[in-house]
Amino acid sequence: MERMNWLSRLASRGPGHRVPQGASLQTPVMADPETCLMVFKNHWSQVVRILERQGPRAAPGGADDLSAVRNHTYQMLTLLAEDRAVPLVPTAPGPLLEFALREDLLTRVLTWQLQWDELGDGVEERRAEQLKLFEMLVSEARQPLLRHGPVREALLILLDACGRPVPSSPALDEGLVLLLSQLCVCLAREPSLLEFFLQPPPEPGAAPRLLLFSRLVPFVHREGTLGQQARDALLLLMALSAGSPTVGCYIADHSYFCPVLATGLSALYSSLPRKIEVPGDDWHCLRREDWLGVPALALFMSSLEFCNAVIQVAHPLVQKQLVDYIHNGFLVPVMGPALHKTSVEEMIASTAYLELFLRSISEPALLRTFLRFLLLHRHDTHTILDTLVARIGSNSRLCMVSLSLFRTLLNLSCEDVLLQLVLRYLVPCNHVMLSQKPAVRDVDLYGRAADKFLSLIPRCCRHHASSPSRPEHASWARGPGSPSVDSSSVVTVHRPSTPSRLALFLRQQSLGGSESPAPAPRSPGLATSPASSPGRRPSPVEEPGELEDNYLEYLREARRGVDRCVQACRTWSAPYDGERPPPEPSPVGSRTKKRSLLPEEGRDNAGGGEEEELGSGGLAGGARESLGHLPPPQLNGLPGPWPEGAKKVRRVPKEGAGEPLEDTSEGMAGLEGFGQELRELEVALSNGGAGSEPPLEPSLPLEEEEAYESFTCSPEPPGPFLSSPLRTLNQLPSQPFTGPFMAVLFAKLENMLQNSVYVNFLLTGLVAQLACHPQPLLRSFLLNTNMVFQPSVKSLLQVLGSVKNKIESFAASQEDFPALLSKAKKYLIARGKLDWTEGPAAGPAPRRSDSLVKSRRPSLGELLLRHAHSPTRARQAAQMVLQPGRDGGAGLGLGGGSPGASTPVLPARGGAPERQGEALRVKNAVYCAVIFPEFLKELAAISQAHAVTSPFLLDTSEEGSGPPVSGFGPLNP
């Protein structure tokens, strides 16, 4: 049905049923058929007298003859376009068409006119006139002309002549594409006629010819309406080829269509801006309004969307060939090196481009080859995915773009992606104590986990009715930006451009519109429950105290997010519950060794075995035979058994089976000691940190600290985060490890006070997105607060407890913390209100240069505040909420009482850079104190949503009972 709708849409875009330029069809429709036939024969008799001469060279008045033939031909074709079939015999040709077919009129006239090409004068003009006449005849004819062989023969002669070396011109190109487009529209109505245009080989051993197709290919990457019209016509041919094996084989075996598309993508990518310079520190992804304003990027996206559509409708041979060419001709030689440029700005640009491509692709086969490139292609011994994971720990801008990319990857609900990132490290269950393995599948029906998360809210962040009332500065919007931008810049309050995350805690997982997958869970904002509901606007006055009453909104959003993930994962190959897939793999084969990504395996780094690893089934279908005890895969799990490191971990107890029992006793004593420490920690956390001393963070082994340090290194020089080994050099293979992705996320979470507000929005959104997944291994790892992990494995609860302690320590050292916290909440609420009071089109669209220098900043609704070009009315609304005043204490911003002022309010110690750095540190910490409690509410709500959803997860009896939710689930072709 979608395909038919698509074809009808393309047909409606064609220039059919219109009067072509230069052709005024003022036909005397009142004339009877006999009169029209008599006039038609009279014109033809005069043309025949000219055609029967010796040729244009011998004729004294050759130019006059050419003009006369042109005029008579125009009159005849005008009459022929109005000819109708006889009512008594509707299938027979009309009288004029029957006469033209009998006389072979079109071919004789065209052959005579082509003789003039030998003179070399006016060839371009004559060719354009011929194309226009035939286009008029095809588009305006009242009868199916293409059913008749003489008409098709004349068209093929004209198309063959268009391949001769003739000086090209816009008029000639436009006429050719217009005629070809009309022919494709006519063939779409009668697909059986397509093979009649496939000419046999002119000589033995030569390839057949499909001029209708080959004349369109050179225009496939052309800019403007001409290129779009050529692509539409080619898409019609691709759809027709799906039902014609002959035409499909011709396109795949005897044309350069697929190489032209792939190499065209490479050439167009090389013209993209290598640096994306944006003034705001909240930018993190390219939106449609961004790339539409950049001609080079708009042309690339048009070609990429065309490739996506071709793979959707073309013959299977063409689909497979195009996918292979895109992988081997664009992704590997172009995108791979682009993602590993030494310049941080170029890394940011290439990562943003990749995220845009993944978000724009809808065809599973094309998306599969992009994911195969990310998961399996190696660059300098490491996969692309490992490199991207490591960059989460880099500077703020590169970190934000990388987080945005992983948000898009998780939105695909692809089993292969989640398996590579997290699940393959959790499947052996080495991260939990042996006695805790059965608890992986436990469901928290009594809300203990939710209670534990809520107990981590720092006391200093809880609402108190007697909050100090102080004059407020508008300095939150004028303070220094993220460390990744110039800290001396002054930013004013702007209006967000997309729906907010329910007015404050704004983290929109989907990117809006049709270019993103189905929205992932969005948490409600720091606003009162009814007022911040998406169905209504907030009240004019909202105080920070109301932010304590929004938990019901979190529950609604969490339920929607969990339900979406459950639906998207229903057909995964295994439930990942600690038993399926089994942690112990079957005997290792050659394909198993290839699948392992551990660096100590010493495999070939060229990545040449990707095709063999994937097999004919693509990313999801290959190398399943090594897991013989598993049922046949139904979806898209990465084929092959688990990593070699996991097998080594599982073999450790077997190798030590003959050791004395006292070792086991010592291990049990260590387990009891760790359990006692955990219980003490739980008691302290349940009291909300009210004791005289905050709970101490459990110390980590040296190996784990080194693992975290490897992902949080300085972004300059960029070398340290270009690769992400799965284990550090000093880490033993048997050491429990939850993978670099979770390690770098936890390390970034632990540094929430140092992150910018935009990084924290993206970061907490990604963790919440992971927590919504229904797999028991992942759910228990993130949300089960009673699970006892190995001493070397840090849990999310520990990370959050550490952040809580840091916030409380900061609040104790900051005398005016309550006022600063209230100021931060009011500012974010004001930013959320601007989104409701101002529509997305409230201001003129900004002009953008090719370098994206003036690209708009992301909005709060995109997880961040995208507002660089907000209208004046929105800025004034924000300034009314944040009425500036004089603050005698140490403040957060650098602004004074007027929008343009920049009066420092920090104690005058050190120089301006020191004051700005201190202001930025305080600003980030207080923003963290606003975000952190809301993140805890979100996690608590997600854990409760799992409790009412988990009993129905991956129920085989329900498989196939309904279509999956929107978004990308299975990768199987």
From Swiss-Prot:
InterPro entries: FHIP (IPR019384), FHIP_C (IPR045669), FHIP_KELAA_motif (IPR045668). GO terms for cellular component: FHF complex. The modification Phosphoserine is found at S467, S510, S523, S529, S533, S859, S898. Keywords: Phosphoprotein, Protein transport, Transport. It holds the Pfam family KELAA. It comes from the Eukaryota. Residues 466-493, 510-547, 573-647 are annotated as: Disordered. Residues 482-493, 529-538, 622-639 have a biased composition (Low complexity). Transmembrane segments: none annotated. GO terms for biological process: early endosome to late endosome transport; endosome organization; endosome to lysosome transport; lysosome organization; protein localization to perinuclear region of cytoplasm; protein transport. The keyword Protein transport applies. Component of the FTS/Hook/FHIP complex (FHF complex). The FHF complex may function to promote vesicle trafficking and/or fusion via the homotypic vesicular protein sorting complex (the HOPS complex). FHF complex promotes the distribution of AP-4 complex to the perinuclear area of the cell. Belongs to the FHIP family. Component of the FTS/Hook/FHIP complex (FHF complex), composed of AKTIP/FTS, FHIP1B, and one or more members of the Hook family of proteins HOOK1, HOOK2, and HOOK3. The FHF complex associates with the homotypic vesicular sorting complex (the HOPS complex). This is FHF complex subunit HOOK-interacting protein 1B. It comes from Bos taurus. The lineage of its organism: Eukaryota, Metazoa, Chordata, Craniata, Vertebrata.
